[in-house]
């Protein structure tokens, strides 16, 4: 079935999958980090229809790879492409794990209006790159052993102290892959997009 992008959406959503700290393996659409984001994209399309355009971002390689920041080139291109195609339409970012780190760095751009960070792999105070006008929501499972809920909570605390509209939501017993508490992860994502859409319509 061919999915047609809406001609005049009110909001654009970039979905940023996870990865790992160091790997030059090619990023493929059927790897687990990509697969776990497709239900988010599908539920957003189903709920909001033509009001929202959704793009699943694909990187070239699977890893962040130190100072190479490997995914950023492809994420920035995706942001540039969608803002060029839909000028003036605000962008919401949804990123899991490494994708949450990508999202924090992309959120330095003024075209970004909101960021949902799901169990983000935030390093070196990535959240400090987020510009003050971005609404930030971060979810983190308390049983996550891959990334650090306390660091996410610290980042949100710093953003709040800066005056940013930022919210931290702990998921009790939640793990890193988001395979538990599915309705909570998905429900919060839909609420996030709904609020972002309302904000876009009242700008």
Description of each model-found segment:
Residues 1-49:
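Short, surface-exposed "cap/lid" segments of acyl-processing enzymes
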Residues 65-85:
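Alpha/beta-hydrolase active-site loop
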Residues 93-95, 118, 139:
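Short beta-strand immediately N-terminal to the catalytic nucleophile in serine-hydrolase-like folds
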Residues 94-99, 103:
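Gly/Ala-rich beta-loop-alpha elbow adjacent to hydrolase catalytic centers
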Residues 111-122:
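A conserved short beta-strand
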Residues 132, 137-144:
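Short beta-strand/loop motif that positions the catalytic acidic residue
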Residues 145-151:
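Conserved alpha/beta-hydrolase "acid-adjacent" motif
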Residues 153, 160-203:
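C-terminal catalytic histidine-bearing segment of alpha/beta-hydrolase fold enzymes
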């Amino acid at each position: 079935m061919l999915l047609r992008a809406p001609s005049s959406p009110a909001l654009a959503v970039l979905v940023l999958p996870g990865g790992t700290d160091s790997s030059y393996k090619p990023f493929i659409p059927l790897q687990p980090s990509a697969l776990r984001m497709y239900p988010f994209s599908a539920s957003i399309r189903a709920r909001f229809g033509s009001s929202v355009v959704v793009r699943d971002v694909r990187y070239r390689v699977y890893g962040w790879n130190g100072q190479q920041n490997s995914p950023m080139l492809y994420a920035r291109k995706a942001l540039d492409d969608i803002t060029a195609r839909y000028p003036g339409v605000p962008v919401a970012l949804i990123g899991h794990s490494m994708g949450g780190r990508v999202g924090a760095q992309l959120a330095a751009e003024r075209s970004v209006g909101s960021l949902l960070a799901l169990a983000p792999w935030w390093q070196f105070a990535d959240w400090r790159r987020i510009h003050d006008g971005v609404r930030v929501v971060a979810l983190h499972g308390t049983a996550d052993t891959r990334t650090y809920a306390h660091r996410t909570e610290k980042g949100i605390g710093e953003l709040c102290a800066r005056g940013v509209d930022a919210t931290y939501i702990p998921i009790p017993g939640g793990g890193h892959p988001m395979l538990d508490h599915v309705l909570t992860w998905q429900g919060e994502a839909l609420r996030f997009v709904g609020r972002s859409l309302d904000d876009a319509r009242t700008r």
